[in-house]
UniProtKB/Swiss-Prot annotation:
<dbReference type="InterPro" id="IPR032819">
    <property type="entry name" value="TruB_C"/>
</dbReference>
<keyword id="KW-0819">tRNA processing</keyword>
<dbReference type="InterPro" id="IPR014780">
    <property type="entry name" value="tRNA_psdUridine_synth_TruB"/>
</dbReference>
<dbReference type="GO" id="GO:0031119">
    <property type="term" value="P:tRNA pseudouridine synthesis"/>
</dbReference>
<dbReference type="InterPro" id="IPR036974">
    <property type="entry name" value="PUA_sf"/>
</dbReference>
<feature type="active site" description="Nucleophile">
    <location>
        <position position="47"/>
    </location>
</feature>
<dbReference type="Pfam" id="PF01509">
    <property type="entry name" value="TruB_N"/>
</dbReference>
<keyword id="KW-0413">Isomerase</keyword>
<dbReference type="InterPro" id="IPR002501">
    <property type="entry name" value="PsdUridine_synth_N"/>
</dbReference>
<dbReference type="InterPro" id="IPR015240">
    <property type="entry name" value="tRNA_sdUridine_synth_fam1_C"/>
</dbReference>
<dbReference type="InterPro" id="IPR015947">
    <property type="entry name" value="PUA-like_sf"/>
</dbReference>
<dbReference type="GO" id="GO:0003723">
    <property type="term" value="F:RNA binding"/>
</dbReference>
<dbReference type="Pfam" id="PF16198">
    <property type="entry name" value="TruB_C_2"/>
</dbReference>
<dbReference type="GO" id="GO:1990481">
    <property type="term" value="P:mRNA pseudouridine synthesis"/>
</dbReference>
<dbReference type="Pfam" id="PF09157">
    <property type="entry name" value="TruB-C_2"/>
</dbReference>
<dbReference type="InterPro" id="IPR020103">
    <property type="entry name" value="PsdUridine_synth_cat_dom_sf"/>
</dbReference>
<comment type="function">
    <text>Responsible for synthesis of pseudouridine from uracil-55 in the psi GC loop of transfer RNAs.</text>
</comment>
Length: 314
């Protein structure tokens, strides 16, 4: 006897405005329950302190979350000068206090040094894993473990405000960039120490800021549906972005139904005019129905990599 599935096969991406004080996984589980979704996954964790854009993939969209993990991000951050903490943010304990003797000219010169490509060593208080455990589990026990530096790129870093011991900046960066580490490094450059007091992610890939929704808004829609005695999906589902928005930057290859059927059965196909390499966004027919992601193989054919499984709600 087939096991009954828990949740419904809803597909799409919800742009959650994560509140401060909860983990990204807690936020994910709340959204999953609200949507009664069968599957859900986020696309790059935010610290509990942080707020802002947390794209949550539902259903088949989870197959394409890696492409959002790899995308550029934008942040707004406020740093407090003069205090260094063990987590590089205000959730941690102050481990060092130093006087702040910083001029605007010195601050601008130090900030400019972060622009471009560099090597960054991740914080011990991060979710990266070492021997199967998150680094923060070691850090909480006072254990320091080796971490490899990673190539990151800061495309843009803008100073918006410098008042007293507070610095407010905007950062546009590549995947895997730790803003806490940038702030900690900035504090050391300035000779006074620093830590993050506010962090807000304002953009992931090309998703529009104005499409974000809060947990409160989702819960209000849920309550409204119960009051009006309608299915919650009627109010909740229109908020979802199409799942192919996760891969909208990939070149599109539109397949005729016969070739699409071959791809959906795992067979590589030859398509005239297709790019010579890389991942491809595969669509089918005149409606350009998204069916998944393929990759050019060594034979010059499109091989299926991640395919959408279409299922109706029961």
């Amino acid at each position: 006897m087939a096991r009954r599935r828990k949740g419904r096969p809803i597909n799409g991406v919800i742009l959650l405005d994560k509140p401060t004080g909860i983990s990204s996984n807690d936020a994910l589980q709340k959204v999953k329950r609200i949507y009664f979704a069968e599957k859900a996954g986020h696309t790059g964790a935010l610290d509990p302190l942080a707020t802002g854009m947390l794209p949550i993939c539902l259903g088949e969209a989870t197959k394409f979350s890696q492409f959002l993990l790899d995308s550029d991000k934008r942040y707004r951050v406020i740093a407090k000068l003069g205090e260094r903490t063990n987590t590089s943010d205000s959730d941690g304990e102050v481990v060092e206090t130093r006087p702040v003797d910083v001029t605007l000219e010195k601050l601008e010169a130090c900030i400019e040094k972060f622009r471009g490509e560099s090597d960054q060593v991740p914080s011990m208080f991060s979710a990266l894993k070492y021997q199967g455990k998150p680094l923060y589990e070691y850090a909480r026990k006072g254990i320091e473990v080796p971490r490899e530096s990673r190539k990151i790129t800061v495309y843009e870093i803008i100073l918006h405000r410098f008042e007293g011991d507070e610095v407010e900046m905007e950062v546009h960066c590549s995947k895997g960039t730790y803003i806490r580490t940038i702030v900690d490094d900035l504090g050391e450059m300035l000779g006074c120490g620093a830590h993050v007091t506010m962090l807000r992610r304002t953009a992931v890939a090309k998703y529009p800021y104005e499409k974000m929704v809060t947990l409160e808004q989702l819960n209000e829609l849920l309550e409204q549906a119960h009051r009006e005695e309608i299915a919650p999906r009627e109010l909740l589902d229109p908020l979802l972005m199409p799942m192919d928005t996760a891969v909208e930057d990939l070149p599109e290859v539109n397949l005729i139904p016969e070739l699409a059927d071959m791809v959906q059965h795992g067979q590589p196909v030859q398509v005239l005019g297709a790019p010579e390499q890389g991942f491809l966004r595969l669509t089918m027919g005149e409606e350009h129905l998204f069916i998944g992601v393929g990759e050019m193989n060594d034979d010059g054919k499109i091989a299926p990599k991640r395919l959408v499984v279409f299922r109706d709600e029961e």
